[in-house]
From Swiss-Prot:
The protein's enzyme class: transferase
Extent of the signal sequence: none
Function: Methylates ribosomal protein L11.
GO BP field: methylation
Subcellular location(s) of the protein: Cytoplasm
Enzyme Commission identifier(s): 2.1.1.-
A single GO cellular-component term on record: cytoplasm
Name by which UniProt lists this protein: Ribosomal protein L11 methyltransferase
Binding of S-adenosyl-L-methionine, residues: T162, G183, D205, N248
Gene (UniProt): prmA
Amino acid sequence: MKWSEICVHTTQLAVEAVSNLLHEVGAQGVVIEDVEDFDRMMAEDHFGEIWDVSDRETYPTSGVHVKAYVPASGDFQDLLSNLKKEIERLRTMLDIGSGDVTVAEIDEEDWAHSWKQYYKPVKISQQLTIVPLWEEYTPQPEENVILLDPGMAFGTGTHPTTMLCIQAIENYIREGDHVIDVGTGSGVLSIAAAKLGAASVKALDLDSVAVESARQNVETNGVGELVQVDTGDLLKGVEGEYDLVVANILADVILLFIEDAYARTKSGGRFITSGIIGEKRAEVTNALVAAGFEIEETRVMEDWVAIIAKKG
């Protein structure tokens, strides 16, 4: 089987939007090549992907490459044409850089190697490291490993918003806590909470593919008895109270259910939310305070913000 590698040259600002476009045309995951991210990871001695310095040679010297792999089928040219139109439409809304699109055809065996080479073990927090399923990895004493298949959609734990959220969970979770994860995606936050001592975790997502992805990842990590994954539209219809409510989703979505999050958080419990771009920080903060939360801590990584809000 032949595969087509689609590569879009863009800016850091447009990475998420371009990634979404690639998902819409059928990509099950994307690869992001950003030399600034690479240099930052190499400079840090704490958290991030475990790379070899020689890997830098494959990265663009400027801008960002967003790559996706789709089957080389008869309708590929139509797919490509639609993608280019959407990229040009995107240009009217934000700086996408050159927006150049290149295509390469590769064989099945090369495809398997091409996308796997981009995924390395990621030290996500003091205690947790995310490891691709195919990697042989020996954890250090007291290090917890989360196994994920990066070929599946909905995130691999390497994005700053996920790192911020997991680090906050690690800092605030207590043994025996009950946790709810809103918009679980790959289930990585739920798995992290379970491995960090939660007594139970309820994971919700509106997307049926995300629900199936999360269920598979939960079972792979041996936390099926602790984590229940269900289809759910934010916190609609959810009853009971939780020690931790966590959500790594965009700010505009967070704003839709802050009052519900307050209602579902136990007194003394916390709402940990990430996925907030810097320019939305004040708006989300004000909405949290208006709902009755006290802002306990705000964490920043690159242009992303995580807010830890406590219910008195």
